[in-house]
Amino acid sequence: MGYKIKSYGWQPDLPDRRDHLYAAPTPILMALPSKVDLRPQCPAVYDQGQLGSCTGNAIAGAFEFDRMKQRIGRKDYVPSRLFIYYNERVIEGTVDSDNGAQIRDGIKSIVKQGVCSEATWPYDIDQFAAKPPVAAYAEGKKNQALAYSRVARSLPQMKGCLASGFPFVFGFTVYESFESPAVAKTGTVDMPKPKEQVVGGHAVVAVGYNDATERFIIRNSWGRKWGMRGYFTLPYLYLVDTNLADDFWTIRLVEDPGQSARRAVGRGAGRKRRRV
C-alpha cells in the first residue's frame, strides 16, 4: 500500500439528556456563507501514530485552535494529547487499555483537569497507561476549557458553528476505502459502498465546508503526509447520517455571549460513564 495505517479509537457517547445543545447565532444562520475554511487558523496537524488516541488528538486540536484564535497564553503551547487520553479513560475506568474513548469524556476532562503542555507530558505512546506527574495536573489547571456544547445533527447548525469561526469535534464510522491509497493521496472520502466492511470508529475535527461540493473539510490526526496535508473531505450526507457519524461537540475557552455554550460548572461535568 505504501502508507502505514494509523489507529482509530472513537467510542460513541452514551445518551445524556443533560447535554446542552449549541445554538448558532441567528444573524449567521440567516446569512450562511457558501463556504468556510478554517485551516489557515489551525495549529500544525498531529500524528497519533499506532495508539487509539484519536479523541485526545481531536480535542487537543480544537483546544489549541481556540487558544490561538482567542490569543490565550504562550504561543509555543501545544496541549498534551496523552494527558487528555489518560484522563478521559480515568472517567471511563479503562486506563490500562488502549481501546479509545468517548469524546464527551475527553471534553469533560479538559473542563475539570484542564490540559498541560506537551512539553510537560510528551506524546510517548509507550506511556499511554502511565499517570501524568503532579506538575502536569497543576499546569493543567491553568489551561481549562470554560464551556462546551453538543452540536445538533443539522447542516445549518454545523455550518453555523464553522461560520462563527469555531471548529467542532465528532466521530464517524470508518470503512475500508478510508484506508485506500487513493484517499491517502487525495483526501477525498466518499459515501461507503454497500459491501464495504467497517474497520473502526475515528474522532476528527470539522474545520470548514463548501456548498459547491457539498463537503465538509476535516482535520485528521495521521500527520501531514496523509490526504490533503493532513486534511480530508466528507460529504454532507456522511455527517447527517445517524449510522455514519455522531457526537458533534464544540468547545470554548472564553465565554462567547453570542451563543449559549454550556458552562463548565454545569451538572454532570464529572459523572463517570462506561463505554458502549
Each language-model region and where it sits:
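Hydrophobic alpha-helical membrane-insertion signals
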Residues: M1-A23
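Short N-terminal secondary-structure initiator segments
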Residues: R17-K35
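Alpha-helical support elements that line or immediately flank enzyme active sites
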Residues: Q48-I72, S164, F170
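Asp/Glu-centered strand-loop micro-motifs enriched in Gly/Pro and often flanked by an aromatic residue
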Residues: K35-Q50
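Conserved aromatic-histidine-acidic binding/catalytic patches
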Residues: Y46-L51, T94-D98
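Active-site-surrounding "flap" and adjacent substrate/cofactor-binding loops of secreted or lumenal enzymes
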Residues: A62-V90
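Predominantly the structural core of cysteine protease catalytic domains
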Residues: G2-Y8, L29-S34, P40, A60-E64, ...
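Catalytic-loop motifs flanking and including active-site residues across diverse enzymes
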Residues: Q50-L51, T55-I59, F83, Q102, ...
